[in-house]
């Protein structure tokens, strides 16, 4: 097939799809039909290209990576695919001839409801780079019918509604009903020894659910490779019960199907109750069981044996959600292919690798042992055996130290620990920034590091720089093309050449003009969607990340309240106008995160009611923040808020997207901020607050938030005003949370300890903004230093040091 059709050929392809799929001509087609027809033609090109690439991989006998993650935050596909394939211009011309505007069609596509935050966006960026670099790769996740949720803000309160994305997004999915697999839950397990010496595993009263794959193609930029993202939908194996239906028992007739299909309805269901925990566990096992069965089937079709699995397959666990792939692969090798335990374990531990994404204790997943045993009886038996053998190994390493061994065990204190089995069953364990990897070795997994020092590695995260710079910010990309050529599009380290222009006033002025144009575009989008007016001459100060206490949107809010009170006291105060922009979703069961959202929304509402204050201070909370919204916002941002409590953020990638688009960072020495400072220089980033070591020492010595409160008049004023509140609502509960939490330590993420440093650093940043030449120079140098943080670099490191992949072109 022709992978690079010209505009005439594209026009013919679209007209053909319109006729076959919708029975209409271009003149009769609606905008939605034209979008879907366009998407189908692109999907067909990608599918053919994928088939050709897969044939090359099979002929080469190349090793493949299978990347498992509970979420992939893809955003929209049409624009990225057209740019990656080099077809954007051809499609634009073809659609113009057909009476449609390509930009309008981009707006028809919903963001794919397959992800939530940084974990899913990282997975999406990595799939993009794997394709662009010609590495054989398949991603695995679940095809969530209703995504995470669609966020609505009603009177400042987050309301979760279903994210109905499939009507517009399903056009990118190819159902593979010929590749379904059975996944078993519950029941009882019996062992029956056969005369030939092998043990047959029998299941009684188990619930069987069918996993149906839906494939999405992931394009690469100017590459031979097309990666595949395989998404699983749950379907009941027991067909519709006609007998019950004819008796009028309609609900009962469909009950089994409904119960089975719940597994693939929603990403991260609330786990504040037993039912939610069971559903999450079911989702995780459903994902890994279907995926491992698929991997084994594909491998056997090419090689006919499994002894060579580690040489031909790399299975990567992205965080602990897919950790059950370790016992599931053991189950298949031992139960279905009759490998000895020792041989099977050798294969597993040379095939699987694990990336840790958090040091937060609540995110290091564990499951109630009784619940786990009831839901996954065979997997529980295997996990117990893994645990017993590991404990014997650990005893030899740490004789007599049962306390240490019990902390390292997979099963202990009534819990089954996913992080521990991930470390034990993987040949590589990596963190996602230098600081994070050090914390893993020195604290989180320190005992494992003593036992397996050779397993631990670091691969700092990266972003799909073509998407976040070239496609999202075409004005800046055009300037870079003129100044340093186009090599940076495929070799992002070449961005460093842009630093040569730091003292070129003409280039600095163009950087500033491009930023202002992007601010105008974003403000226009916000006004059209919400009616809210943003002053494009104000500083765009941006904090965009999921709402969590450790990310400290609350610290940002405290500073905003201080500015609000300054203006309330003196409306004529000379101040650089500032617009604070937030994009964040709170987990449905996370009450404090929801209160912080309400605080931000009420501050915004209060400011809207005070026109004099709004001239200099504005707060914008973006409802239902998404990837497509980020693509408009990030190029317009001038200040990037990366203010997590030091030692809590593993890496962060939003900071990298903002940096590569010329925003200046205010942040703690946490996550990737440390390496960003090294890359751009301390003089071009605004660092404040406690370090990770200082945070640890403060905890050990006894943190008392009240000490910081009583010694800071500005803080006293701000926190007292929380009780007065905004737009008629008091936030005395947040004041209490900061000062005298009745359920633990007050101010657990040290907002008060870091407040003065944050306030002074932010003030210095606004002062620097007044000197346009200095600010634009710093902005330019941030762009030039951002090449290190491209996903292409991350993937090359994974491929070389962890997966052992070779490129297939």
Show the residue positions of the predicted features.
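A conserved ligand/cofactor-binding region detector
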Residues: 1-809
């Amino acid at each position: 097939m022709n992978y690079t059709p010209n505009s005439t050929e594209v026009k013919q392809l679209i007209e053909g799809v319109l006729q076959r799929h919708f029975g209409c001509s271009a003149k009769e087609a609606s905008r939605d039909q034209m979008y879907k027809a366009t998407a189908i033609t692109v999907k067909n090109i990608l599918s053919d290209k994928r088939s050709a690439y897969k044939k090359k991989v099979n002929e080469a006998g190349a090793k493949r990576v299978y990347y498992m993650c509970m979420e992939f935050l893809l955003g929209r596909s049409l624009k990225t695919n057209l740019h990656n394939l080099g077809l954007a211009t051809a499609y634009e011309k073809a659609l113009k001839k057909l009476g449609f505007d390509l930009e309008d069609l981009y707006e028809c596509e919903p963001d794919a409801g397959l992800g939530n935050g940084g974990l899913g966006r990282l997975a999406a960026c990595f799939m993009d780079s794997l394709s662009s670099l010609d590495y054989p790769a398949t991603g695995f996740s679940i095809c969530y019918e209703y995504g995470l949720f669609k966020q609505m803000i009603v009177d400042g309160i987050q309301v979760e509604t279903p994210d109905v994305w499939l009507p517009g997004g399903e056009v990118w999915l190819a159902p593979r009903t010929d590749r379904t697999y059975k996944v078993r839950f519950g029941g009882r397990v019996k062992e029956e020894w056969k005369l030939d010496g092998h043990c047959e595993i029998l299941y009684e009263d188990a619930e069987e659910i069918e996993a149906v794959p839906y494939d999405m193609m992931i394009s690469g930029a100017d590459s031979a490779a097309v990666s595949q993202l395989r998404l699983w939908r749950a379907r009941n194996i027991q067909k519709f019960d006609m007998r019950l239906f004819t008796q009028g028992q309609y609900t009962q007739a469909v009950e089994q199907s409904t119960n089975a299909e719940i597994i693939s309805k929603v990403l991260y269901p609330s786990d504040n109750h037993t039912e939610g925990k069971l559903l999450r566990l079911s989702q995780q096992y459903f994902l890994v069981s279907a995926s491992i069965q698929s991997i084994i089937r594909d491998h056997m079709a090419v090689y006919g044996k499994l002894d060579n699995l580690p040489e031909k397959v790399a299975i990567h666990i992205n965080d602990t959600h897919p950790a059950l792939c370790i016992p599931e692969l053991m189950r298949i090798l031992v139960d279905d292919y009759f490998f000895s335990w020792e041989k099977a374990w050798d294969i597993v531990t040379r095939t699987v690798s694990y990336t840790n994404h958090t040091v937060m204790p609540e995110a290091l997943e564990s499951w109630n042992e009784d619940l786990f045993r009831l839901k996954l009886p065979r997997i529980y038996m295997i996990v117990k055996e893994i645990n017993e053998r590991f404990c014997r190994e650990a005893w030899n390493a740490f004789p007599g130290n049962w306390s240490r061994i019990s902390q390292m065990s997979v099963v202990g204190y009534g819990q089954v620990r996913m992080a521990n089995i991930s470390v034990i069953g993987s040949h590589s364990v990596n963190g996602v920034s230098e600081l994070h990897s050090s914390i893993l070795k020195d604290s989180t997994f320190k005992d494992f590091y003593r036992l397996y020092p050779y397993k631990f590695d670091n691969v700092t995260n990266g972003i799909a720089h073509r998407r976040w710079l070239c496609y999202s910010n075409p004005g800046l990309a055009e300037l870079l093309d003129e100044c340093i050529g186009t090599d940076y599009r495929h070799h992002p380290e070449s961005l460093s050449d842009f630093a040569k222009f730091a003292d070129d006033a003409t280039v600095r002025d163009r950087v500033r003009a491009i930023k202002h144009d992007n601010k105008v575009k974003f403000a226009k989008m916000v006004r059209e969607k919400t009616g809210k007016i943003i002053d494009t001459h104000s500083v765009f100060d941006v904090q965009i990340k999921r709402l969590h206490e450790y990310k400290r949107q609350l610290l940002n809010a405290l500073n905003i309240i201080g500015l609000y009170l300054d203006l309330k006291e003196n409306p004529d105060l000379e101040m650089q106008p500032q617009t604070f922009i937030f994009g964040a979703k709170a987990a449905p069961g996370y009450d404090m995160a929801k209160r912080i959202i309400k605080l931000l929304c009420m501050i915004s509402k209060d400011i809207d009611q005070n026109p004099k204050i709004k001239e200099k201070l504005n707060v914008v909370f973006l409802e239902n923040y998404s990837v497509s919204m980020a693509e408009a916002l990030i190029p317009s941002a001038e200040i990037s808020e990366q203010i997590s409590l030091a030692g809590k953020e593993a890496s962060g990638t939003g900071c990298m997207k903002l940096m590569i688009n010329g925003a200046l960072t205010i942040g703690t020495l946490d996550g990737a901020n440390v390496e960003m400072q090294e890359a751009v220089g301390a003089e071009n980033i605004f660092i404040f607050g406690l370090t990770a070591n200082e945070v640890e020492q403060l905890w050990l010595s006894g943190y008392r938030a009240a000490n910081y409160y009583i010694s800071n008049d500005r803080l006293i004023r701000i926190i007292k005003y929380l009780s007065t509140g905004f737009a008629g609502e008091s936030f005395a509960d947040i004041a209490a949370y900061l000062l005298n939490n009745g359920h633990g330590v007050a101010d657990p993420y040290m907002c008060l300890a870091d407040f003065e440093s944050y306030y002074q650093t932010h003030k210095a940043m606004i002062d620097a903004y007044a000197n346009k030449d200095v600010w634009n120079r710093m902005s330019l140098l941030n762009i030039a230093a951002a090449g290190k943080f491209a996903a292409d670099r991350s993937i090359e490191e994974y491929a070389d040091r962890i997966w052992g992949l070779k490129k297939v072109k």
